[in-house]
From Swiss-Prot:
The active site is at R177, S250, E346. Its main location: cytoplasm. It comes from the Bacteria. This is UDP-N-acetylenolpyruvoylglucosamine reductase. One of its GO terms (cellular component) is cytosol. It comes from Bordetella parapertussis (strain 12822 / ATCC BAA-587 / NCTC 13253). Gene3D superfamilies: 3.30.465.10, UDP-N-acetylenolpyruvoylglucosamine reductase, C-terminal domain, Uridine Diphospho-n-acetylenolpyruvylglucosamine Reductase, domain 2. It catalyses: UDP-N-acetyl-alpha-D-muramate + NADP(+) = UDP-N-acetyl-3-O-(1-carboxyvinyl)-alpha-D-glucosamine + NADPH + H(+).
Length: 353
């Protein structure tokens, strides 16, 4: 793989002093979790210190907003939360704005700032929880747009190599809810900043049925602000607020199947919800599969399935990782027995050791 090393700046190394930390408020599922060793990364100059510190621990767990992780009751290792701040316009040309955001920026806050400044193109990704740095790892997507569609490049810290590396789309190897980073040793990389190429002129992406049905987008030429507002309204109506009900957003990926499998399923289940993909495959609506298995609104111990969106697993109070994963396994089993399709979880499941 071709990557370019960023020349190191000559600056003092900021020290890191690990401390014990309760992580219940550091994950949107609200799971009880404890880190005996925790550090917050607030400036790039701390990354060399992280490289020096990490080998002393069994594992390094890198956290962003904690919106796409399942944390164990106790983590035997070092937990580093990325809080690097900053948003700036770094370039523009005839067909794109290039906007850079530091990894610790709140994702929705960044999208809002782009809309406010007329840097359009990310509005379909509004209200996705988490941070900018976590977004490329998952290749987040919603309502017809993926991060990869707007990606320019990123800068990441190679923890073992002790260097900053510049990576383009080819190096990141984006796929559906997937990237290069998800196939590396956990804690091997810390994303420092991400740059986005936002199209000029802008065209709305309204392929998703919910957006097509939204009254605010009935006009002939909807603005980016109107799309942003519609996405926020739809998400608030369908998805629980993690500040009120602990959840990690969509817990399962929409499974991809070939045309033959989809046709066979349609023969048995005429109401099957599916979406054609550019490569000829079909994406099945995981929420529909789960709902048809009778899981919407059900509870298993302290974990449950949201009553309005079957893709969302929730913490009903006092849940731990084992409760969430037991519920996920039960759902996977029912869906596979009925449809012959295996659902894959979206969140990263952090091992205790």
């Amino acid at each position: 793989m071709s990557m370019s090393t960023v020349p190191a700046c000559i600056e003092p190394v900021a020290p890191l002093a690990p401390q014990a930390q309760d992580l219940r408020c550091f994950n949107t599922l609200g799971l009880a979790s404890h880190a005996p060793a925790f550090v917050a990364l607030t400036e790039p100059s701390q990354l060399p210190a992280l490289s020096a510190l990490a080998p002393r621990f069994r594992q390094l767990v890198v956290l962003g907003g904690g919106s796409n992780v399942v944390l164990p009751a106790s983590i035997d290792g070092l937990v580093a939360q990325v809080r690097l701040p900053g948003v700036r316009l770094v370039g523009q040309c005839a067909d794109a704005w290039v906007v850079e955001a530091a990894a610790g920026e709140n994702w929705h806050g960044f999208v809002t700032a782009c809309v406010d400044n007329g840097w359009d193109g990310l509005e379909n990704l509004a209200l996705i929880p988490g941070t900018v740095g976590a977004a490329p790892v998952q290749n987040i997507g919603a309502y017809g747009v993926e991060l990869a569609d707007r990606f320019h490049s990123l800068t990441a810290w190679d923890v073992k190599g002790g260097r900053w590396v510049e990576m383009g789309a080819a190096e990141c190897r984006f796929a559906y809810r997937d990237s290069f980073f998800k196939h590396q040793e956990p804690g091997a990389w810390v994303i420092g900043s991400v740059r986005f190429a936002l199209p000029r002129p802008w065209q709305p992406v309204l392929d998703y049925p919910d957006l097509q049905r939204h009254a605010a987008l009935d006009g002939a030429a909807p603005t980016a602000r109107a799309v942003y507002d519609a996405v926020c309204a739809i998400r608030r109506a369908k998805l629980p607020d993690p500040a009120v009900v602990g959840n990690a957003g969509s817990f399962f990926k929409n499974p991809l199947v070939d045309a033959g499998t989809r046709q066979a399923l349609l023969g048995r289940f005429p109401g099957l919800v599916s979406y054609p993909q550019p490569d000829g495959r079909y994406k099945l609506a995981a929420g529909w599969l789960i709902d048809q298995c009778g899981w919407k609104g059900r509870q298993l111990g302290a974990a449950g399935v949201h009553d309005r969106q079957a893709l969302v697993l929730v913490n009903r109070g006092g849940a731990q990782a084992r409760d969430i994963m037991a519920l996920a396994a039960a759902i996977q089993g029912d869906v596979e027995r009925r449809y012959g399709v295996r659902l894959e979880p979206e969140p990263v499941v952090v091992p205790a050791r």
